[in-house]
């Protein structure tokens, strides 16, 4: 897993002393690390406020992820188009195309043209927009089309009648006499509306949103829409009458920007706006990171219009620090508004060419500090250092300008407790198909895979993905999938079948929505085309396309109710634990010679008398912490008497082992059982591990235990004194 250790703003002139900024970075808390595995810490440096998401989107692997050809319904197409428009807008305003290429700018413009053309397919006769032509038009979506098209008008040719027709519909059909804009047909993809999704102060926030869109289209449409100026004034007056009663920082920020566009944000209104800023750098609602990015971006735009350049830098720094490791802001509105605000900032405050900073990193594992110079020309370059040591370190920054430091530690974490599903409930089952079901001639067997899922939010989930890995040797029936995707009921949007690197197929199913009020179930046949010795389980994962944290995974297998994977993993190597559970030795007929023969077999590594002192239950394995009380035969790991040693066993072996806290056990195992580097060695309990109860001294007084205790004592003495005969 990845754990963010620290995100710091580097600004020596403002945050340092005497022009030198010192930062102490702690070590990561990796107390849940899998024993014997390594960790890696990455230290990332970058100039501010150059945006990593934009660069990744235009140049590199994230091109396909963030800048895509528009597709889907009228809402999905706008979601796809948003990133491309804002990326080009940002790079144009910051004059950074020389760092990419004009060819790539042209490619991005072609994508915008395609998105624009496809959006026109959802323009209704009244010039409004909805997800589908037969659906009632949406106020918010139509206003958002106006907003995006107004920004894109400087990039591609956009018909002013298309843009202004939407403006006219908003005014004539959706504005009340008091200036309020009403929504009668909310969008299906609620996640695309950002902070507007909150039901508190929804009417006022929507009115501010539409008002901003109208003002951004004013220069284009004022001559075509005679009532535009009057409409803007009515909405402005409505917000003025209600502004002092607003409570949400989001509502305060978006309304403030709408007011600042008309140079009306003054006096008590300005004080109200500034008072909602937490620590003078963000307009924040607890637990709503993306809403906060969006709201703070509106606030930054308002501050820029006010020319309040003393208040601007802290907001820019906070926005920049919200970039998480590996990607951008992560939502339609947060991304769009974030980069619109940052682009405007770099246009209005063009002082970044003064960026010239030296960062010195002192890692404990290195004798001399590592130095990086960050200058304007290479501000976008992501500089990184890596270390295998999980230790705190110090850093100093000197010079002019701003930068961002991110520290992330990657390590293998134990899966503790039951895996929880976030926002989705998922049930999976697989059963043998009835004899009457037709199967391909060369199929060995046919089964039916079914899964039912429900979204646990307050509204239906919009576009969601089912990621299904097939069991070994099985493939899905494409005829069934085609019926599901093209039939009269059309249960799924589309599907993709990919051959994975292993011998297992992966099926991706796209769903337009998942109900929050009832389970939605799908089933299709899967065929086994070749037999394998051990059928490994498959998995079904459901997740939200626009919020990857909302997810649930369940395993399936024809012979296992929960489909749990029976394996133990260390680094990239996994050991199959299927049918490898060791039965604790309870046979009273075991003799001294039996133990000597077994303990001296080739490949046997260690023989210990141990005491179980602690048990940790994880999701797929148990960890038994044993204290080695007597090293009857030293192993390659060189454990000393009195030293603790963790033994790991698959959860399915728990009942077979029957180990009890505080009890003693005779244990031995193969040389391949210890894993990990000293002193973090762990031991795998497999089918060749010997585990035998060793009674306590008082228990040895009982007649039934006397012979057992004598044999164990004689065994230990013989091994210590004489060793193995071979």
From Swiss-Prot:
The record marks 726 as: Coordinates Mg(2+) for interaction with Complement factor B Bb fragment (CFB). Keywords: Complement alternate pathway, Complement pathway, Disulfide bond, Glycoprotein, Immunity, Inflammatory response, Innate immunity, Phosphoprotein, Secreted, Thioester bond. Its main location: secreted. C3 precursor is first processed by the removal of 4 Arg residues, forming two chains, beta and alpha, linked by a disulfide bond. During activation of the complement systems, the alpha chain is cleaved into C3a and C3b by the C3 convertase: C3b stays linked to the beta chain, while C3a is released in the plasma. The alpha chain is cleaved by the serine protease complement C2b component of the C3 convertase to generate C3a and C3b following activation by the classical, lectin and GZMK complement systems. Residues 697-722 are annotated as: Interaction with CFP/properdin. Residues 1-21 are annotated as: Disordered. It is found in: Secreted. GO terms for biological process: complement activation, alternative pathway; complement activation, classical pathway; inflammatory response. There is a cross-link at residues 73-76 (Isoglutamyl cysteine thioester (Cys-Gln)). The modification Phosphoserine is found at residues 31, 384, 636. Complement activation is inhibited by VSIG4. GO terms for cellular component: extracellular space. Disulfide bonds join 581-653, 600-724. Residues 581-724 form the NTR domain. InterPro entries: A-macroglobulin_rcpt-bd, A-macroglobulin_rcpt-bd_sf, A2M/Complement_sys, Alpha-macroglob_thiol-ester_cl, Alpha-macroglobulin_TED, C3_CUB1, C3_CUB2, MacrogloblnA2_CS. Precursor of non-enzymatic components of the classical, alternative, lectin and GZMK complement pathways, which consist in a cascade of proteins that leads to phagocytosis and breakdown of pathogens and signaling that strengthens the adaptive immune system. In absence of complement activation, the C3 precursor is first processed by the removal of 4 Arg residues, forming two chains, beta and alpha, linked by a disulfide bond. This is Complement C3 alpha chain. It comes from Oryctolagus cuniculus.
């Amino acid at each position: 897993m990845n754990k963010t250790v620290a995100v710091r703003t580097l600004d020596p002139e403002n945050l340092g002393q005497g022009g030198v900024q010192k930062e102490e970075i702690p070590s990561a808390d990796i107390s849940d690390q899998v024993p014997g595995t390594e960790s890696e810490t990455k230290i990332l440096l970058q100039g501010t406020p150059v945006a990593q998401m934009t660069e990744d989107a235009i140049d590199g692997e994230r091109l396909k992820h963030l800048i895509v050809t528009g597709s889907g319904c009228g809402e999905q197409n706008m979601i796809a188009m948003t990133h491309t428009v804002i990326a080009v807008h940002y790079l144009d305003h910051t004059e950074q195309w020389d760092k990419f290429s004009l060819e790539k700018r042209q490619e991005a413009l072609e994508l915008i043209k395609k998105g624009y053309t496809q959006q026109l397919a959802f323009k209704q006769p009244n010039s409004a927009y909805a997800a589908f032509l037969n659906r009632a038009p949406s106020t918010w979506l139509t206003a958002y089309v106006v907003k995006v098209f107004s920004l894109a008008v400087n990039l591609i040719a956009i018909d002013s009648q298309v843009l202004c027709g939407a403006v006219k519909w908003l005014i004539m059909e959706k504005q009340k006499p008091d200036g309020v804009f009403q929504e009668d047909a909310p969008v299906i993809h609620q996640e695309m509306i950002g902070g507007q999704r909150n039901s508190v102060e929804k009417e006022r926030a929507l009115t501010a949103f539409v008002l901003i869109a109208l003002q951004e289209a004013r220069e284009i449409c004022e001559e075509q829409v005679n009532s535009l100026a009057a409409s803007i004034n009515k909405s402005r007056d409505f917000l003025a009458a209600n502004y002092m009663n607003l409570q949400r920082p989001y509502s305060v920020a978006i309304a403030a920007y709408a007011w600042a566009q008309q140079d009306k944000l003054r006096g008590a209104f300005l004080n109200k706006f500034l008072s909602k800023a937490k620590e003078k750098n963000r307009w924040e609602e607890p637990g709503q990171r993306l809403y906060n990015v969006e709201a703070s971006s509106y606030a930054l735009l308002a501050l820029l219009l006010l020319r309040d350049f003393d208040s601007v830098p802290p907001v820019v720094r906070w926005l920049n620090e919200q970039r998480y490791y590996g990607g951008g802001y992560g939502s339609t509105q947060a991304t769009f508004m974030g980069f619109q605000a940052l682009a405007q900032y770099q246009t209005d405050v063009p002082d970044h060419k003064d960026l010239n900073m030296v960062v010195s990193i002192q890692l404990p594992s290195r004798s001399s500090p590592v130095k990086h110079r960050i200058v304007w020309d290479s501000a976008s370059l992501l500089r990184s250092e890596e270390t295998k040591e999980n230790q705190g370190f110090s850093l100093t920054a000197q010079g002019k300008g701003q930068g961002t430091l991110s520290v992330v530690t990657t390590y293998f974490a134990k899966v503790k407790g039951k895996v929880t599903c976030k926002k989705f409930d998922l049930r999976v089952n697989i059963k043998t198909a009835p004899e009457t079901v037709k199967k391909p001639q060369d199929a060995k067997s046919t089964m039916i895979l079914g899964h039912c899922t429900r979204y646990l939010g307050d509204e239906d989930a919009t576009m969601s993905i089912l990621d299904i890995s097939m069991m070994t040797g099985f493939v899905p029936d494409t005829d069934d999938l085609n019926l599901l995707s093209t039939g009269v009921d059309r249960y799924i949007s589309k599907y993709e079948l990919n051959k994975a690197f292993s011998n297992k197929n992966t099926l991706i199913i796209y769903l337009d929505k998942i109900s929050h009020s009832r389970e939605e179930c799908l089933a299709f046949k899967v065929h086994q085309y070749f037999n394998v010795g051990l059928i490994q389980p498959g998995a079904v994962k459901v997740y939200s396309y626009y919020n990857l944290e909302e997810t649930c995974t369940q395993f399936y297998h024809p012979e296992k109710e929960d489909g749990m994977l029976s394996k133990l993993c260390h680094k990239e190597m996994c050991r199959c634990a299927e049918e490898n559970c060791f039965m604790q030795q309870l046979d009273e007929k075991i003799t001294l010679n039996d133990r000597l023969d077994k303990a001296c077999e080739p490949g046997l590594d260690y023989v210990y008398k141990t005491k179980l002192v602690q048990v940790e239950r994880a999701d797929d394995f148990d960890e038994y912490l044993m204290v080695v009380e007597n090293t009857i035969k030293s192993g390659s790991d060189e454990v000393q008497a009195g030293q603790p040693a963790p033994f790991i066993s698959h959860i399915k072996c728990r009942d077979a082992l029957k180990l009890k806290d505080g009890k003693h056990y005779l244990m031995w195992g193969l040389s391949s059982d210890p894993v990990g580097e000293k002193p973090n060695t762990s031991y795998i309990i497999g089918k060749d591990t010997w585990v035998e109860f060793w009674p306590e001294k008082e228990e040895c007084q009982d007649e039934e235990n006397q012979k057992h205790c004598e044999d164990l004592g004689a065994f230990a003495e013989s091994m210590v004194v004489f060793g193995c005969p071979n």
